[in-house]
């Protein structure tokens, strides 16, 4: 509630903090574990040349190419990556990667690694990460859903690392799963 005395207007009101969601009633449901509204957040990335990395976890499809995560062209060997803290720990059931509006600058391939980590872990450390989704080919301006490609008997996770090869843009990343 905001009160203005005696009169006037408010152009913008921004509230900052951490999302606290009650997961108790959703133990057997498949929910989006990665969404901003569920408490998901970006922990780190190696490049974010264009756009806003947090848009990657937003609702709906991207409105423009700037409404997503895009990296600069990579001239050196390697790949680009982003690490996402899930809203809560869970068992991954389905992964969705949306390349909306990325037509000539979408990644050729992607893979996902996941881990169950403690707060304050080093996002650059490779020792925690295990392969959840092996390399998959992506296409322009499309929603890519992966279910059967996900590693079996993976166990619970609370952080994921999206790897894109070699570079490019992703509009949305969604991780669906069961809350533990």
For every predicted segment, state its role.
Residues 1-81, 90-91, 101-180:
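Trp- and acidic/polar-enriched beta-sheet ligand-binding modules for extracellular glycan
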């Amino acid at each position: 509630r905001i009160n203005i005395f005696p009169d006037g207007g408010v152009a913008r009101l921004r509230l900052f903090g951490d999302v606290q969601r009650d997961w108790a009633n959703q133990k057997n449901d498949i929910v989006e574990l990665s969404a901003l509204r569920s408490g998901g957040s970006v922990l780190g990335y190696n490049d974010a040349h264009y756009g806003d990395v947090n848009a990657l976890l937003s609702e709906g499809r991207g409105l423009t190419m700037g409404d997503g995560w895009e990296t600069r062209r990579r001239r050196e060997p390697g790949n680009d990556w982003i690490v996402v803290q899930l809203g809560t720990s869970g068992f991954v059931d389905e992964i969705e990667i949306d390349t909306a509006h990325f037509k000539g600058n979408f990644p050729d391939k992607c893979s996902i690694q996941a881990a169950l980590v403690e707060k304050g872990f080093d996002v650059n450390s490779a020792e925690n990460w295990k392969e959840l989704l092996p390399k998959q080919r992506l296409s322009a301006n499309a929603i890519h859903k992966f279910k059967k490609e996900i590693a079996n008997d993976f166990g619970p996770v609370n952080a994921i690392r999206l790897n894109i090869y070699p570079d490019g843009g992703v509009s949305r990343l969604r991780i669906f799963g069961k809350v533990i």
